[in-house]
Structure formats: C-alpha cells, structure tokens
C-alpha cells in the first residue's frame, strides 16, 4: 500500500539561497536566527531557553541546516541518532511566494514573473478599483496600500465597520487582499467580492497570483482578530502537478488539510479538510492518516509559522510553535507503515529577525522518513521539484518535467 504524507511548515527556511541578494535577503536564515535568539535568551515569552527540537533533529534538520549554511543551528542536538534522509533545496521559481513554492514542490516551478502592485501607497490601478466598486455595489474602499494584515485592521477596522467600505491591501507578494468584518460586512459577501476581484484581475491581465479573503471579528483597535475563514483564490498551476497526476493516472486520493486546496486552485485535490491553528491542523492530519488508503497523499500546510509568527516578526512565538510541532511529531510518525513516505519541508523563508514583514528567499529543508527510506544526506537539491519527482516515481506516475528522484 503506497501512501505519502507531505507536511509543509510554511515559511520554515534554513538559510539564504545563492540568489537571495537579488531579493534583498542575503544572510536571512529563519531557523538559524531563531535558534540564536533562543540561545541568547531573547525568545523567552511563552517558552524559555535554547531551541529544543529533538524529533526534527533525529530526522536530520540540524544537519540539513548545516549543509545549507555551513553552521549547525545552536541548541539543536549535534549527536542525534539520524533516522531519516535529509537535505536542503533551492528554489527554481522566480518568486518567494506561497503558490510558487507549493507548485514547485508538486513538480511545477513558476518560471514566469508574477504581476505585483509595487507602489506602497495608492497601490492599485484606479480602473480596477472603479470596476470593483461598481460590480460589487460598494460605498467605496479603504486602504489601497501595502500593509501588514494585523496593522491595517487596527488602523482601519473601525472605519470599515462604520462605512461598510472593504479594506484593500497588498504586500511584496503577488496578492490582492480584502479584509472585511464577518458580522457587519458578512462572510458570504466578502467571498463574493473576492470572486469579482479574481475575475477582474484575470480579465485585466494583471497576472496576480492570489486574491485573499481576510475576514475578522472584534469591535475596536487592539481587539480585532482575523478568523479561520480565510479563503485564497489562486490561479491554476500552468502544468499538471504530481497531485493531479496521482488522481488522473491512478485514480488516487489527495487530501488537502489547511490551505493546500486553495493554493492549487482546487486542481488535483479530491478531499478538503478545514482546520485552524497548529494543534487542529495536527489533529486533522492524524485523523486523515489513519483513514488513508492505497495511492493516497495527505498534504498539510501549517500556515501559522508564516502568518502568525514569520510575518509578525515574532521570534519567541515561532520558536514555541516549532517546539509544539516537534513534541507532536512522534504521534504522526507512529502511524507510518512499511511502504509509507513522510516528507517534511517548507515553501520559502520568513525570517522573524529580518527587516520588514515579507518572506525571505531561502533554502528549504527536505526531510524524508519511512521504513524503506535509507537514512543519510540527500545533499543540495537544485529545485523543490525534486520532491514532486520523487513522489511521482514512488507512485509510478509519468515523470514530471522538472526535478530528480531523491530516493
């Protein structure tokens, strides 16, 4: 029985890639800098002491990071008994965004350039804004700028509730984000507005990767909270991913947990499981692993590392989340059967010690575990697509156009 379980620790980079300089990210190192901050006693909110990841260390995380940067992450166990195959991968795709990273993991790198709204103020073309106001019958809009999602709620949330004007904002990523109050504006209305925005961006040739619905609740600044009802409207991958091939060629199952289905625009996904928060995502993953049959991929995105800690530059929060993930990892590993493969990886970096609030261009860890997987170094993988090619070969699918089988 062949089953693969892919866990994406969203934004968990392990050192700047060779091309990081052109992204302004030379020297970024999500894992390394978190570990250093913990060792210096600078990440003692909600946790304390050196970064402790014994289970990830046994899978080779520390050694993969050392291969990536030349430095072993401080605090991790150098003498861990390695039980998995480990390496690090560079990104072939042109961006450092979520869709590019995930599509490349599934064997389809993004070799074109996304469109971006690069102006920090008055970010969106007036023609686009006018169409959205008219089609969605809006009283106007707020924002129209680059911002962190939590900051803009404190700035404009109250005005949004009074006026009914949605908050439009973007970032260094190829995104059009819309924040609206779940109760005063309405969740269904927000989703409808996002559908309209997706249509207009596509029809207008803007080449924007995602429209993101950002619903929130609360009644005043400091009390506004984003809810778990986020919804991403992505464009479809430009070629069949290994997910789609498993479904098409083997009649297989691909179970999306978290935001995976949205990232692939629902293509190649046979079942969606919604969960919010690290523990809930872990619980859902374990339940689906228990039920998984032959020719199944269970694919989970642990978004909190990125959204709650990376972008918010919360080092202690990121460290605590990694330690929580590590503590729960044995529950997941206990479910691995003889022919199963477990892959732990990431889609980009988001160094919480780095200036700004954006992603960082980094290598990702590639940790592979299973009874038939030979422990040891996988070395430097030249593309995330090596993961997709490995999974395609494991299931006996037609080869992907990019990547090499690692096993």
From Swiss-Prot:
GO terms for molecular function: magnesium ion binding; manganese ion binding; phosphopentomutase activity. It is an enzyme of class 5 (isomerase). Keywords: Cytoplasm, Isomerase, Manganese, Metal-binding. GO terms for cellular component: cytosol. Pathway: Carbohydrate degradation; 2-deoxy-D-ribose 1-phosphate degradation; D-glyceraldehyde 3-phosphate and acetaldehyde from 2-deoxy-alpha-D-ribose 1-phosphate: step 1/2. It comes from the Bacteria. It is found in: Cytoplasm. The keyword Isomerase applies. Mn(2+) 2 binds at residues 306, 311, 359. GO terms for biological process: 2-deoxyribose 1-phosphate catabolic process; 5-phosphoribose 1-diphosphate biosynthetic process; metabolic compound salvage; nucleotide metabolic process. Its EC number is 5.4.2.7. Binds 2 manganese ions. It catalyses: 2-deoxy-alpha-D-ribose 1-phosphate = 2-deoxy-D-ribose 5-phosphate; alpha-D-ribose 1-phosphate = D-ribose 5-phosphate. The keyword Isomerase applies. Mn(2+) 1 binds at residues 10, 347-348. Disulfide bonds: none annotated. Its cofactor is Mn(2+). Isomerase that catalyzes the conversion of deoxy-ribose 1-phosphate (dRib-1-P) and ribose 1-phosphate (Rib-1-P) to deoxy-ribose 5-phosphate (dRib-5-P) and ribose 5-phosphate (Rib-5-P), respectively. Belongs to the phosphopentomutase family. HAMAP family: Phosphopentomut. This is Phosphopentomutase. It comes from Yersinia pestis. The lineage of its organism: Bacteria, Pseudomonadati, Pseudomonadota, Gammaproteobacteria, Enterobacterales.
């Amino acid at each position: 029985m062949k089953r693969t379980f892919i866990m994406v620790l969203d934004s968990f980079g392990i050192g700047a890639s060779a091309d990081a300089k052109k992204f302004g990210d030379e020297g970024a190192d999500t894992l390394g800098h978190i570990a250093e901050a913990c060792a210096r006693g600078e990440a003692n909110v909600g946790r304390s002491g050196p970064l402790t990841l014994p289970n990830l260390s046994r899978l080779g995380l520390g050694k993969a990071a050392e291969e990536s940067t030349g430095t072993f992450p401080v605090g991790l166990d150098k003498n861990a008994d390695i039980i998995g195959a480990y390496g690090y991968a560079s990104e072939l795709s042109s961006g450092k965004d979520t869709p590019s990273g995930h599509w490349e993991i599934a064997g389809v790198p993004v070799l074109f350039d996304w469109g971006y709204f690069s102006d920090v103020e008055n970010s969106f073309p007036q023609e686009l804004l006018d169409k959205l106001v008219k089609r969605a019958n809006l009283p106007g809009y707020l924002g129209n700028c680059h911002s962190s999602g939590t900051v803009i709620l404190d700035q404009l949330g109250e005005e949004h509730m009074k006026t009914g004007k949605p908050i439009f904002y973007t970032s260094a990523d190829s995104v059009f984000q819309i924040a609206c109050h779940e109760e005063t504006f309405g969740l269904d209305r927000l989703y409808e507005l996002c559908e309209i925005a997706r249509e207009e961006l596509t029809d207008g040739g803007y080449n924007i990767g995602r429209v993101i619905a950002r619903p929130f609740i609360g009644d005043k600044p400091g009390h506004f909270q984003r809810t778990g009802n986020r919804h991403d409207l992505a464009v479809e991958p430009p070629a069949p991913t290994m997910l789609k091939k498993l479904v098409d060629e083997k009649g297989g199952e691909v179970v999306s947990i978290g935001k995976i289905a949205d990232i692939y625009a629902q293509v190649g996904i046979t079942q969606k499981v919604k969960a919010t928060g690290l523990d809930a995502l872990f619980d859902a993953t374990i339940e689906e692993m228990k039920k998984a049959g032959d020719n199944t991929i269970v694919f989970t995105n642990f978004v909190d590392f990125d959204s709650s800690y990376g972008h918010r530059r919360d080092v202690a929060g990121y460290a605590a989340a990694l330690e929580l993930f590590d503590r729960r990892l044995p529950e997941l590993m206990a479910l691995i059967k003889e022919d199963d493969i477990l892959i732990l990886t990431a889609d980009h970096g988001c160094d919480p010690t780095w200036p700004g609030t954006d992603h960082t261009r980094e290598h990702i860890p590639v940790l592979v575990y299973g009874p038939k997987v030979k422990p040891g170094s996988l070395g430097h993988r030249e593309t995330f697509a090596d993961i997709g090619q490995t999974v395609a070969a494991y299931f006996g699918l037609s080869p992907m156009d990019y990547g090499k089988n690692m096993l």
